[in-house]
């Protein structure tokens, strides 16, 4: 591994959605192996995470939280409340209300932050 612990992945979304989903799922594997990884797309950033964390944002920023088995999922600094979502779509289309937001839980989840003005 040559001591590399931080990775930014670009070009992982493209013409085939099945390949995109495969690349997104790899983010969780990289995190489990101890890597700090981000996937940068045309519209935002995917960040795999586990347990309680705080994320930089700005008021009005679109945010999605995809649960990968986290328990006790709660949020602070988001428009809509979080819960132990059982389907990926349930945590989509949220919105930050401050310069940061926090996710409180035990377990794994994936954050998507919209960085584009297109949406």
List each model region and its residues.
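Class I SAM-dependent methyltransferase SAM-binding "motif I" and its flanking Rossmann-like core
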Residues: 29-57
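Short phosphate-binding loop-to-helix
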Residues: 1-2
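N-terminal glycine-rich phosphate/adenylate-binding segment common to multiple enzyme folds
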Residues: 5-16
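Long, charged alpha-helical interface segments
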Residues: 49-119
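Short beta-strand segments
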Residues: 10-12, 40-41, 66
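Short Gly/Thr/Asp-enriched flexible loops that form oxyanion-binding sites at enzyme active sites
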Residues: 14-28
